[in-house]
């Protein structure tokens, strides 16, 4: 057979540069390609010019909070503001509801729904006294709500080219067009580049793929964030003890969970208010409260996680779907627990909290399996009270006596997508290292190839045949490990929530024994010094 085609050196160099140094100017499409976007931008500008009364209805997660903060920043740079409304997860549930929208429409001229609203037909219809603009990314049906504009790359009549964007990125696209219209009117528009820190946070926290446009948004957003110019993000980094320039990892695992904590186990609007804060003292007070709630969330999550895993194991982990449901499980942590089950089994997972004959659940999927469309289908079939989402994450509400039937049907639909054909969760190893080779210089080279995240994973290393020197519990159930190569080189490893896991038990009970270890590398900052640590994912006896 003929040899495969090869890139010439110039083309290869261009590919290399686009991956390592993606530029927004090279990857940013014309926002007007999205349906209703130009109309939505014009309506926003008209509201600002006429000094209309504005309200923002935002989802209670990081993407919703970041989207709301983006809009508020843009408005405030023009001397305007808006009422912020974030629904209570338990009392109101996801998305716009009739009482809230009727109330907002009574004393506002324009309501902008961000990261929600695409399936809220009754609630949008109830807001007749105001115009409603929806900026969302969740899967839509053929029919759309009766809003002034619905900007959503996952509308059925869209091309799908931008379906990977989170809601905050879609809001950013709307504001790019709004700024274009402002410049066309010979006015100076707000600074959008300085808002990319919020877009980066939402993109990573919502597990959007870090490829193409998303990669450029996150790369630039991390640069903006390192300037510590946004009081809310600065305060969140400080309460988390983050004293280095942030990486994508910190957005997903350090800052993101704290922003989410208010919507999960506290007051729903705390995260959005912290991100939108302009006063450093207010931002710090909100960040402190979110940090406290995040600690509460961890304790609640641990209880639900243990019960859900026990139930799922009893039901079986070899099907197309792993699921669990329990009375009194906090609806604010079921999504995190579903993510833990998905990570542990390599299969789509759904976890449902039951109360008063009704279950509220959340699901997480694996690459190549569209969970959102499957849940939307069983909702249309009448097995759910409601349900929807996107490919990798979705939510649902179901009657308690319908759970078995709904999960059976969902498993069938996911099996048709190939979910049941996946084998045991294997780790892909990129290279083998010894402790002495895991240096700060190596980490600098790895980080230069970032940002890493969904669809752009950081390299995973195996440390073969190393000796376990010490294992102990740190924090709330984390495993801290020291290991060496027997030649004098040693390093530290950490497995979050790993102390009571089978891996944690094996390592803590076999001090002095030799194991193969695998995971990704990170930098540990302690006492003014830097060292490389292994974020441990798996271990096996080497003998």
What name fits each language-model region?
Residues 2, 6, 61-66, 161-169, ...:
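Short, conserved micro-motifs enriched in small and acidic residues
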Residues 114-166:
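Histidine/acidic-residue-rich, glycine-tolerant segments that coordinate divalent metal ions
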Residues 13-109, 129, 180-402:
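Hydrophobic helix-and-loop "lid/oligomerization" segment in the mid-to-C-terminal part
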Residues 70, 145-185, 192-204:
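Short alpha-helices
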Residues 50, 212, 282-324, 369, ...:
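Mid-to-C-terminal polyanion-binding domains and interfaces
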Residues 2-5, 137-138, 153, 330, ...:
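Histidine-centered active-site/metal-ligand motif
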Residues 1-16:
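Short, small-residue-biased leader/transition segments that mark boundaries at the very start
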Residues 9, 112, 260, 446, ...:
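A residue-level signal for conserved active-site and pocket-lining positions in enzyme catalytic cores
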């Amino acid at each position: 057979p003929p040899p495969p085609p090869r890139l010439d050196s110039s083309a290869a160099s261009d590919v290399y540069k686009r991956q390592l140094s993606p530029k927004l100017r090279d990857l940013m499409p014309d926002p007007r390609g999205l349906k209703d976007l130009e109309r939505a931008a014009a309506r926003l500008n008209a509201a600002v010019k006429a000094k209309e009364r504005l309200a923002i209805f935002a989802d209670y997660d990081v993407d919703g909070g970041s989207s709301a903060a983006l809009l508020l920043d843009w408005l405030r740079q023009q001397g305007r503001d808006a009422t912020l409304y974030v629904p209570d997860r338990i009392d109101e549930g996801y998305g716009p509801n009739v009482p809230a929208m009727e109330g907002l429409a009574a004393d506002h001229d324009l309501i902008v729904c961000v990261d929600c609203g695409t399936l809220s037909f009754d609630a949008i219809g109830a807001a007749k006294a105001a115009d409603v603009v929806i900026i969302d990314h969740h899967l839509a049906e053929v029919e759309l709500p009766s809003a002034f504009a619905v900007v959503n790359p996952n509308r059925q009549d869209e091309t799908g080219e931008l379906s990977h964007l989170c809601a905050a990125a879609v809001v950013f696209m709307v504001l790019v067009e709004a700024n274009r219209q402002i410049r066309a009117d010979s006015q100076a528009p707000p600074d959008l580049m300085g808002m990319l820190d919020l877009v980066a946070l939402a993109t990573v926290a919502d597990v959007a793929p870090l490829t193409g446009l998303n990669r450029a948004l996150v790369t630039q957003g991390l640069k903006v964030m390192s300037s510590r110019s946004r009081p809310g993000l600065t305060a969140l980094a400080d309460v988390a003890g983050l004293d280095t320039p942030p990486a994508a990892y910190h957005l997903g695992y350090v800052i993101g969970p704290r922003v989410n904590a208010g919507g999960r186990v506290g007051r729903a609007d705390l995260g959005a208010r912290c991100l939108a804060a302009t006063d450093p003292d207010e931002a710090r007070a909100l960040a402190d409260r979110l940090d406290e709630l995040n600690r509460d969330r961890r304790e609640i999550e641990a209880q639900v996680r243990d019960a859900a895993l026990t139930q799922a194991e009893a039901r079986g982990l070899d099907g197309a779907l792993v699921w669990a449901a329990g009375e009194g499980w906090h609806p604010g942590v079921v999504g995190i627990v579903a993510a833990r089950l998905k990570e542990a089994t390599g299969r789509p997972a759904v976890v449902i909290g039951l109360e008063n004959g009704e279950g509220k659940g959340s699901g997480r999927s694996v690459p190549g399996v569209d969970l959102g469309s499957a849940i939307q289908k069983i909702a249309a079939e009448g097995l759910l009270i409601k349900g929807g989402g996107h490919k990798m994450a979705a939510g649902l509400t179901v009657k308690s006596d319908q759970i078995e039937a709904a999960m059976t049907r969902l498993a069938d639909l996911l099996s048709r997508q190939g979910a049941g054909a996946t084998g045991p969760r294997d780790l892909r190893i990129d290279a083998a290292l010894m402790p002495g080779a895991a240096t700060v210089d190596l980490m600098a080279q790895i980080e230069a190839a970032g940002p890493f995240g969904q669809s752009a994973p950081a390299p995973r290393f195996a440390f073969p045949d190393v000796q376990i020197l010490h294992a102990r519990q740190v924090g709330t159930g984390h495993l801290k490990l020291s290991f060496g190569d027997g030649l004098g080189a040693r390093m530290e490893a950490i497995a979050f929530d790993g102390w009571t896991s089978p891996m944690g038990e094996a390592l803590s009970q076999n001090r002095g024994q030799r194991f193969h270890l695998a995971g990704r590398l990170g930098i540990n900052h302690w006492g003014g010094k830097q060292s490389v640590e292994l974020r441990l994912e798996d271990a096996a006896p080497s003998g």
